[in-house]
Amino acid sequence: MLLRPNSGNTLKYGCLLTKRWLTTSKLLYSVEDMKIKIGQEQYRKALEERIDKIPIENYRNFSIVAHVDHGKSTLSDRLLEMTGVIKPGSKSQVLDKLDVERERGITVKAQTVSMFYNDGKQDYLLHLVDTPGHVDFRAEVSRSYASCGGALLLVDASQGVQAQTVANFYLAYSMGLKLIPIINKIDLDSANIPGAREQIETTFELDPNECIPVSAKTGLNVEQIIPSVIKNIPSPVCDVNKPLRALLVDSWHDPYVGVVMLVHIVDGRMKKGMKILSAHTNRTYDVKEVGIMYPDRTPTSFIKAGQVAYIIPGMKNPREALVGDTFYQMGKHEGLEPLPGFEEPKPMVFVGAFPADGKEFNAMDDQMQNLVLNDRSVTLEQETSNALGLGWRLGFLGSLHASVFKERLEKEYGAKIILTAPTVPYKIIYKNGEEKIVTNPDDFPDNQKHHDVESYMEPYVEAIMTVPNEYVGNVMTLCLNNRGEQKEIEYLTTGQVLLKYEIPTSQLVEDFFGKLKGCTKGYASLDYEEAGYRKSDIVKMQLCVNGEPQDALTTVIHRSQAQARGKEYVTRFKKFLSYQLFEVAIQAKINNKVVARETIKAKRKDVTQRLHAADISRYKKLLERQKEGKKQMKLSGRVTIKNDAYQAFLRRED
């Protein structure tokens, strides 16, 4: 039986570092209360003593699988309140550290928090690993799942199973995680609990009787979750007596202490002062600090097998922190195998980035480098554009990743930036057997080099969409217009349909999700995963103004879309160009062949306004001279295009 603060019993350090909701609704001491009551140093010792006494059999590592806006962060907050990690009513979305995560309601970086729970008989140490739900951050998701024994499968009672839920379920299931179905938002008038149970049974083949209906917002039934976690999720398979092996789950850069790494200790122990070795870079580091997230960094003397904790390794360059890497203790690593799952992040969307004001390049370069320090999945190279000047070629995991990066740059540094249209990595196979990946449309082979190429290949994704039944026809038409191929259709309930299509990645990054939302009145959801490369008839299209290619507007498209896309480009770009004293031709070209053209007529001065009406010969002479002058001007004149025109075009303004 847990002691309450007002009972007459003696308070023993380490016994009351938790609280849980009781039938009387009286709470035990929270983390903040205990720090104040017994002091920081005694609190730390009590914490270490408590951790050391808990056997690994009483550890539970779990995650939450959910679609965006199904209440994952709110449920996390309730669990933290229930276990005394935070006070009730404190700031929401505790695990979302970045401003952009709070504002968008998404998780970008994997986070963890440790929780203590006592069932009245014994202590348990729980690690909740909060993972990004979006496919762009799938590397963090898979590494996080690797450190868990199970997951809560969260489904919105009013919306039912959605695309992201399905995609993350399959990932969790393939990694052997034990899944506990949770139906959230049962307090809503639109909640359909029987319908949600039916979807969980038909889509995931889980027992509907095991579903726990809760309201994360009000806390209703949330107290049933942790006992279910303890009962159903297995303890981690690890051995504290074996040599150290730690899996790197995620990392971030702290301006004061450098790189902070989130690790899952699979075997052994790690403590401050230990020298550790990276399995993949072969670099060594001296551990400056270890501890648990409770909910923020809380230093301890050691961390041991089974824990998901943080370390500060004294790493200077954050790009050395490779997600999925294994760390050993130096001198005790002979014969040890790295933990499975290491994978270098592969950017799938590339954009050109340029400062709105060219004079700001140097200052923005420093800001860009600082932001990349905290996200090693972003690739960064300097490039030069004839149209926009000095800039960068950035590689991202997906279009959401690119959007989040741009938003962070603007909000954290106040930077104004121009992003070119997103492109994907195309594979070119030459006749001599050489293969090349092209990420910049300007580097795509033109007419002169075309004869050396055996074939062109473009990446595809398998898109998973859930839509209301009445919009299925609209979605099928949208997928067909975007060169999609139907793979599967499944009726989840009478009202919801799950569609699987294989779609070119290039079509997906061109606001496919926005179009999907538009044709379903916002009711559709989307997730996707890579589906490899396919041979494709893709071509480079250049936008030329008076014969001069505008490299910032060069794009790679499928030949079947060339004419329609070319017409759209020249018509739209014409709106942003000012009139000149000579005729301006705007052309879309493929292999030097014009596929679309628009013309801006020359500004014309009335040179005959002062002539007498009867002076025909003089009238003709002046018009002829003007015509000749404009001809010369067209040959030698250059069209000056302001940055505003490029910005407006790339923002797709009308």
Swiss-Prot record:
The record's EC number reads 3.6.5.-
Q: Tell me the enzyme class.
A: hydrolase
Q: Looking at the UniProt record for this protein, which Gene Ontology cellular component terms does it annotate, in alphabetical order?
A: mitochondrial inner membrane; mitochondrial matrix; mitochondrion
Does the record bear ATP-binding in its keywords? no
Q: How does it sit in the membrane?
A: Peripheral membrane protein
Checking Gene3D superfamilies in the record gives: 3.30.70.240, Elongation factor 4, C-terminal domain (3.30.70.2570), Elongation Factor G (Translational Gtpase), domain 3 (3.30.70.870), P-loop containing nucleotide triphosphate hydrolases (3.40.50.300), Translation factors (2.40.30.10)
Q: Which GO terms describe its molecular function?
A: GTP binding; GTPase activity; mitochondrial ribosome binding
Keyword list (alphabetical) reads: GTP-binding, Hydrolase, Membrane, Mitochondrion, Mitochondrion inner membrane, Nucleotide-binding, Protein biosynthesis
**Where would I find the tr-type G domain in this sequence?**
57-237
InterPro entries xref list: EF-4, EFG_III/V, EFG_V-like, EFTu-like_2, G_TR_CS, LepA_C_sf, LepA_CTD, LepA_IV
Annotated residues for binding of GTP: 66-73, 130-134, 184-187
| UniProt KW Plastid keyword | no
What Pfam families does the database record attribute to this sequence?
EFG_C, GTP_EFTU, GTP_EFTU_D2, LepA_C
What are the BP-aspect GO terms?
positive regulation of translation; translation
Where does it localize? Mitochondrion inner membrane
Q: Which superkingdom heads the taxonomic lineage of this protein's source?
A: Eukaryota
Main subcellular location of this protein, as a coarse class: mitochondrion
- Catalytic activity, reaction form: GTP + H2O = GDP + phosphate + H(+)
Q: What does this protein do?
A: Promotes mitochondrial protein synthesis. May act as a fidelity factor of the translation reaction, by catalyzing a one-codon backward translocation of tRNAs on improperly translocated ribosomes. Binds to mitochondrial ribosomes in a GTP-dependent manner.
For this protein, the record's PANTHER family field holds: TRANSLATION FACTOR GUF1, MITOCHONDRIAL, TRANSLATION FACTOR GUF1-RELATED
- Family of the protein in this entry: Belongs to the TRAFAC class translation factor GTPase superfamily. Classic translation factor GTPase family. LepA subfamily.
Any extra detail in the entry?
This protein may be expected to contain an N-terminal transit peptide but none has been predicted.
Question: Which protein are we looking at?
Answer: Translation factor GUF1, mitochondrial
Per the UniProt record, the lineage of the source organism begins with: Eukaryota, Fungi, Dikarya, Ascomycota, Saccharomycotina
